[in-house]
Amino acid sequence: MSQRELVVLGTASQVPTRQRNHNGYLLRWGREGVLFDPGEGTQRQMAFAGVAATDITRIALTHFHGDHCLGLPGIVQRINLDRVAHPVDAYYPASGQEYFDRLCSASSFYRRVDLRTHPIAGPGPLDAPDAPFTIEAVALSHPVEAFGYRLTEPAGVRMLPDRLAALGIHGPRIGELQRAGSLLVDGRTVTVAEVSEPRPGQSFAFVMDTRLCPGVAELAAGVDMLVIEATFLDADAHLAEEYGHLTAGQAARVAADADVRTLVLTHFSQRYRTLDDHRAEAEKHFSGEVVVAEDLHRIPLPPRR
């Protein structure tokens, strides 16, 4: 299977700290590199993380608050400076078109890259040319319009060695069966369905600034990896509700209810000196893998089910 991992470029919320840069997350998915919410300093964090401008194939903004988009000018200019040969697709709330245009034209530079824009007018599937996954936008609840993203690989099949062997299908003939869909064996036709079982594709959800709402659960449902904001702790839930954010406990309860496999917490308020309580709060409610994100960490997607 191709490399699939999350490269964490920044984990702060509104105010960066000495240890935490503003947001930035690159999802590597084979030849795809989806850059989510590049905040200030993302370009420099890419250098530290070993991420090249040519790795970026798509940019996805959840909303137009500065900590989620002020790195966009540098990214757009860098992909042009480095003469990235492939088109780059950009997704963002259509209501922020004015901000997007300003960010992409923040200063003079030579435009060499085909930046294909996909403003999101409402929830639903998005155009993802040549992608090995579908992309869906789901509305969230924040003081400005915000969307979360869900990426889903199409379902496939898993060949069953025991059934293949029982029918005398070995070596190159297995590939022939997979390509053709059926194969003549000892005078009868064997189909792929007879020697395989369904294999669900991998899935990934990205949930940033939002209070609890139906969209959070919709995005999280059954995903292999959920990257979700945990700005506050449950003790400060009143602040989370007031400002349109989540607590670590809320994020963990969502993950538990949704049968998530790997929970990645991020977007932490600068009010907390350590994140030990975030982990403890999450593990109290969620028994799966909990990752408290750190800048420059690489988090592999869990193996296929």
UniProtKB/Swiss-Prot annotation:
- Please give the family membership noted in the entry: Belongs to the RNase Z family.
Paste the cofactor note: Binds 2 Zn(2+) ions.
Q: Which NCBIfam families match?
A: PRK00055.2-3
Organism taxonomic ancestry: Bacteria, Bacillati, Actinomycetota, Actinomycetes, Mycobacteriales
Residues that hold Zn(2+) 2 according to the record = D67, H68, D209, H267
The protein depicted here goes by the name Ribonuclease Z
Q: Where is the active site?
A: D67
Keyword Hydrolase assigned: yes
